[in-house]
Amino acid sequence: MAEILVDKLKEILKEGKLYLNEPMKRHTSFKIGGPADVLAVPGSRDELINLIAYLRQEKIPFFILGNGTNLLVSEKGIRGVVVKLSSLRNVIVEGTKIIAEAGASLSYIANVALVHELTGFEFASGIPGTLGGAIVMNAGAYGSEMKDVVEKVEVLDENNNILILSNQEMKFSYRYSILQEKEWIVLRAWISLERGNYEEIKKKMEELNQRRKEKQPLDYPSAGSTFKRPPGYYAGKLIEDAGLKGYSIGGAKVSEKHSGFIINTGNATFYDVLNLIEYIQKVVKEKFGVELMPEIKIVGEK
């Protein structure tokens, strides 16, 4: 990356941080991924807005990163600038509403809700991502989704205007929102909850997290559920019924605890995971005629 660009980015990121040739495996739950040319961590909302405006003006490619919990990044890494939102994590409570920035983790928001005796967000307490990423993909668990609790979302559009989208305008559906079609960036969101009882909320969070521990391979790096649920089926059951439970390619393996997860057993490469995804898709299509679509996002130079 040209020195002049780095100097300009440093000028913009007075509170933030800048890393050159930063290995993405340090920033993804899969623990896989080569270097980002530049990793920028804006220190505030204004720094994020100014940074994005500059990158767009100079036509420098960029990629927005939350917690990296739903990503498979290639060993060749990501060209341009990876913008990590980890410092944008302010959360405030107004009555029964929580207003949270995009980089706030779902578990932290769930704990804020608990402390303020607000119910409705328990389902998200064990999802290991950030609010921004969860909204973009309408993340969900245990029968609830972001669309059930998100009242409105503030985004930065492609012309660097700030827009507020209602729940309806987000066009939420299963693992989908309108943001997947746009070059818009989540800044913050309003989460609408209900008054509840501290002990009951805590009990529900503990029960859901216990279920998660029992059923999911949390001891290994992964990116959560590998595939979206096909209509009328469960991806994990199809994979298991296809005889692929425990099947591995290199260091990538179909979890024996839950076949819907691909895990990194220690030294998996990008292509180990990619080849395993494609092999699972092929076998499930041949045996059951069902097309499995990846839920994880695949990024970087192939």
UniProtKB/Swiss-Prot annotation:
Residues 31-196 form the FAD-binding PCMH-type domain. Disulfide bonds: none annotated. SUPFAM superfamilies: FAD-binding/transporter-associated domain-like, Uridine diphospho-N-Acetylenolpyruvylglucosamine reductase, MurB, C-terminal domain. One of its GO terms (cellular component) is cytosol. Its cofactor is FAD. NCBIfam families: murB, PRK13905.1. Belongs to the MurB family. This is UDP-N-acetylenolpyruvoylglucosamine reductase. It comes from Caldanaerobacter subterraneus subsp. tengcongensis (strain DSM 15242 / JCM 11007 / NBRC 100824 / MB4) (Thermoanaerobacter tengcongensis). The gene is murB.
